[in-house]
């Protein structure tokens, strides 16, 4: 499995949060595609 994206934390900027959510969505897609 690819490594899970690191959460930027509570004090993250909107840009960091956006980047994290995009990476997380990509990660979930990879994981679920491998599983099924």
Swiss-Prot record:
It comes from the Eukaryota. It comes from Phyllomedusa bicolor (Two-colored leaf frog). Skin. GO terms for molecular function: neuropeptide hormone activity; neuropeptide Y receptor binding. The modification Tyrosine amide is found at residue 36. Pfam families: Hormone_3. One of its GO terms (biological process) is neuropeptide signaling pathway. The keyword Secreted applies. This is Skin peptide tyrosine-tyrosine.
């Amino acid at each position: 499995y690819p490594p899970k994206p690191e959460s930027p934390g509570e004090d993250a900027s909107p840009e960091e949060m956006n980047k994290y959510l995009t990476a997380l969505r990509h990660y979930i897609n990879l994981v679920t595609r491998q599983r099924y």
